[in-house]
Amino acid sequence: MSTWNLLLKHEDLGEESKRRIKATLNKTISLKELELAVADGWVEKKRRKRTVTVEKSKALGDSFEDEVWTAFYRMGFDYMNSTNKFELSYSSSNPALTKQIDVIAMDDETCLFVECKETDKLDRTKQWKTDLEAMYGHYKGICDEITSKFGRKKFKYIFATRNYAIGQTDLDRIRDFNFAFFDEDSVKYYDGLATHLGTAAKYQLLGSLFAGKEIKGLDMNVPAIEGKMGGLTYYSFSIEPSKLLKVAYVLHRNNANHDLMPTYQRLIQKPRLKAIQEFVNQGGYFPNSLIISIDSGGHQLQFDKANTQVEDSVSRVGVLHLPRRYQSAYIIDGQHRLYGYSGSRFESTNCIPVVAFVDLNKEAQLNCSWI
């Protein structure tokens, strides 16, 4: 049977996050237990009158798993596993058949499963055919199990490793199974991103995992003004931050790379982001528009002109149908203002002004960013 009691809401995972974020295991025991604890690998850290605090290194694999779990926790997913004993049934006919899940992270639209593998020394020979094929065989079943309890979602299985050099055959197998692969650099990248951006990092992760995929049920139709400027067509509109966050991105590359963190830190400055988040949560607002470039996906954007127009005006009013795809809106200017709404109580009730161009090339994007 699935161990649903070990799948908790984000607000109920505070104590687990404190344990996972520590580099070592710690506990307080009585003095009479100290000798046995030392024999078991624990090291005395602080002695008191009747008790003593001891610590020891986490077991191989646990530290990496905790690092991955903590990164996803910082991103603010709605549900996560509270321990590594969480299991999901993969057989509707025999619920007793289960698969242990190292990390599960879920929100209202997506569900991510992560399997973590770590070794203490670099291993260039390990083959993962059996492990990957076993997961692929269980994958539909565990997705169906989640769907039966939480409804339809977008799923992604992530195979995360540390100190393993994955061969091309296994990388091809991961791609063919529509899985994702994170090496230690990818994990460091997303952990750093979560530390830097907080809950806003989730949208960059999901955008990378599901780039170009439709977000079903997302209403992206907005009242808009169509205008002309510099030989380009643009649209001016207002939209809820919660909607734009789901389709927006700030870096063109999809591959997670720890070397990209300085670029993120330049584009989105943590002190400024924090200040804007506090300003927004206090009821503050920004009247100036975000500037974005919409990726049309090779299709002309639908703009339904209103029946009533102003005569002799270049502008037109109507309803703009924005793409409902991950990574379909590149943020040229206004990153802090947008991501400042992430996790805010106003992210679904406020509207922010936007000026949107369509399929701008990089040179044109640079021209917009410094104006």
Where in the sequence are the language-model features?
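Active-site-proximal loop/hinge segments that shape catalytic or ion-binding/gating pockets
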Residues: I215-P262, R266, K270, G284, ...
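Short glycine/proline-rich turn/loop motifs
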Residues: K49-R50, V250-L260, S315-P323
